Amino acid sequence: MKTEISLPLAIFFSDNGNGSWVVSNATWPSDPSYFAHSFSDGPVWNEHVANALHLELVNIATGGATTNNGFVQGRTGPESEIPVPSTAEQIASFLSWDVPRPGDVFVHWSGVNEILFNPNVTGSQTTSWINENIETLYRAGARNIVLGNYNDIETFPGTYNASGYQSDNVKSYMDDLSIGLRNIVGAYSAYANTALVEAQTLFRNIAANPEEYGIDEKYNATYSSIPTIQ
């Protein structure tokens, strides 16, 4: 069904949001301190962005999602046992009931859960699936596209000092993914408005200077259900 909204949309395909609450039949996350059933204690980045840009938020993201479930299956739940829609499926869902408009902004922020669920994948492999998703959006009419990268996997509070996350492949994954994302942004910049949110640089600054950001214990996790790499 076509959405009747006067404002341009901000559409988010990602691995966060409150979709886990839906796919878990309203059982996860169960901690009442999580705001609006998302993995946060308050409004999250996409809500702030939509408000700042005066865009109508359409958040299709689901915690635990990967870029393509045929490549790496995304999961959520207390034991990461519940399969979730990938960003490819999130895009297909949106395009089944709406079409891009000239002022709509599409944010595709994905790629971290692949290495969390499978330590043998590479950043370039994940990038190829992200590129397919962006091509789908572009061919459907999307002309404002934003991508984002992440902090280094081995510095996540839930993975810090975990033996399964110390391999050379894991440590190089985010740099390789970021190179691929920059290439995608550059390639499509000739045909659309594109941008990359450099979260990796920000998080590296936070890790190096946590006190400047008001962080006392940078490696303490608030959400501890991280899949174990065997």
Region annotations inferred by a language model:
Residues 1-25, 186, 194, 210-213:
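Eukaryotic N-terminal targeting leaders
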Residues 5-15, 47, 56-61, 104-110, ...:
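Structural recognition of the beta-strand scaffold that forms the well-ordered cores
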Residues 16-18, 67-71, 115-117, 154-159:
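Short acidic/His/Gly/Ser-rich catalytic and metal-binding motifs that mark active-site loops
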Residues 18, 25, 120, 124-125, ...:
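N-linked glycosylation sites
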Residues 29-128:
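Conserved SGNH/GDSL esterase-like catalytic core that processes O-acyl groups on lipids
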Residues 35, 116-120, 153-175:
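Serine-dependent acyl-ester chemistry module
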Residues 48-55, 136-144, 176-197:
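A structural motif corresponding to the C-terminal end of an alpha-helix
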Residues 152-168, 187, 192-230:
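Mobile gating loops/cap/lid regions near enzyme active sites that modulate substrate access
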